[in-house]
Amino acid sequence: MAYEYSESKYLPSGLERVENPAMYEVGGLHPVNLGQSYQEGRYKIAHKLGNGGFSTTWLARDSRNNTYVALKFVTSAASEGYGDLKTLRDISSGSDAQAGYEYINHLLDEFYVDGPNGHHLCLVSKALGASVANISSDLHRLSGKASQEVASQAVSALGYLHSLGICHGDFTSANVLFQLLGTLDTLNVDELYAVLGNPVKESVRTRDGSAVGLSAPSYVVESIDFAAVPTLLSLRLKVIDFDQAFQISTPPSKMLGTPPRCLSPEAIFDHEVGVASDVWALGCLIFRIRSGYELFGNFGGPSPYYALMQIVKTLGKLPKKWRNRRFDDHGYPAEDSNDDAEVLVCEPLQAPLVDAVLEIERSPIGSSVSDRDNLEAMVWTPSAEYGSVNGEESTAYISKEEADCLFDLLSKIFRFRPEERLGLQEIADHPWFKLQI
């Protein structure tokens, strides 16, 4: 759950990829500055990697191993009794001989730091690059071959978690990241900045013009945009963010904090989650990897109501037990006794799955090469010209053979009944992963 902050004394930042300064208060974020060191000088902050609902993540130099690592500083409120720490330890306790182990971003170290806003947990893991959401988007796409490779790794990663009796719970394109090439570790900080650019900073300011104080840093730092430097990225992925993870034997009884576009219908309506709901999210991820957009997230707003509208438009009518369920003003399922709640109204199959698959664009011929360690060579831009028909640019779609094969895979994943969905081994063995595209 995201940290709930009070009305902020700080002005919002004008930068895009930064945390909300309002989160710098007691119970909130720990103020981190470039050049600071932690754990008796072992980890030195070099750049910013990202921020989330209750954390900031920084690129740091590990002087002991001469590598760059990620330091995730959790809000002090979330650090207290941090329930995900056991899950992270369990995930990292497996053997690297197990299939899928290599595609999980394992916990390398953990420590606590005291600051003006409280007692903060810091999690150390391998530093990673851009996410699938960044690379497979409106601006960038993966080639067909790269899509198969990345999707196959995602299946293997999820299989590893399930073999430990753990569900990820938030298996989305934002939580699947590409690894950085080893050359990054050979760079000192000045050389790192020469490649990535100097950190973009903006001073933190108060609303009344008073001094910032100790609770906030003197400046916020914009996160690195690794999608802009694909030469640093490998085609190998790692899965991150286990905040929504749970034991298969003891699933949560409330709705997961997963983006609704990736939630299965039973997770939305009945809060029933498990292996099958992870498989549904995997199906959403596979479509995003191949197409560059979310199958159930391009209509309305970011609520379960609109996600379900897209599901109905794509897959057809909901099972009878869900058809008359009502939704509150925020788009979440409401109690049947709430007469003010709204019933889902949508024409089924307005945008069927088969059409969505047929409309996936393929990369221009000759745009990809066989070097599996070079992600840059596997990425293309949708604006690339394919050729001209009657003086107008034409778009090339994936072949009918691939469309039929991919549709077969996805249609067997996106089943309303969880027990009817493909298992992970069946997905891994599906012909689409071996198709020459």
Question: How would you describe each model-predicted region?
Answer:
Residues 1-437:
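Intrinsically disordered, low-complexity regulatory segments of kinases
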